[in-house]
Design a protein with these regions (language model features):
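Conserved micro-motifs of the catalytic ATP-binding
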Residues: 4-7
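Short alpha-helical Gxxx[C/S/T] motif in the catalytic ATP-binding
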Residues: 85, 89
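Conserved glycine-rich
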Residues: 97-98
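Short beta-strand/loop element within the Bergerat-fold HATPase_c
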Residues: 33-43
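Short conserved segment of the HATPase_c
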Residues: 56-68
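Acidic ATP/Mg2+-coordinating residue in the GHKL
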Residues: 51
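Short helix-loop "hinge" at the ATP-lid/N-box region of the Bergerat-fold HATPase_c
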Residues: 23-24
Length: 123
């Protein structure tokens, strides 16, 4: 059977693009990698976007979805960013009835996980 999730395609593109853009922006390895997984759950799907970049400190994980929060306010302007991207991502996911969280290990990478409810299963 096929799994169907009802979502605004443009909004979901923003979510995926923002997360991948952050992964690329903070990649500090020449052999950088981004993996995307879609996990089929009973009544939802879970999407995971994982990189092997510099990671996020545990103390910052609960705050990265806050508007204007930056894990390192002293970053140089070459990395850019205003600190609103992940707050927008969170709002879009929540507006679609889902939720998002991150796991990370400094020096090893970050994984963004988000869950969206299934609409139906088609045979």
């Amino acid at each position: 059977p096929s799994t169907v999730v009802i979502a605004d395609a443009e909004q979901m593109k923003k979510v995926i693009n923002n997360i991948i853009s952050n992964s690329v922006k903070y990649m500090d390895k020449p052999n950088g990698r981004i993996d995307i997984r879609i996990l089929d759950r009973d009544d939802s799907i879970q999407i995971e976007i994982e990189d092997n970049g510099k990671g996020i400190a545990q103390k910052d994980l609960t705050r990265i979805f806050e508007r204007f929060y930056r894990t390192d306010a002293s970053r140089n302007s070459a990395q850019g960013g205003s600190g609103i991207g992940l707050s927008i991502v969170k709002k879009i996911i929540e507006d679609h009835g889902g939720y998002i969280w991150a796991t990370a290990k400094e020096g090893e990478g970050t994984c963004m996980h988000f869950v969206l409810r299934k609409y139906a299963e088609l045979s």
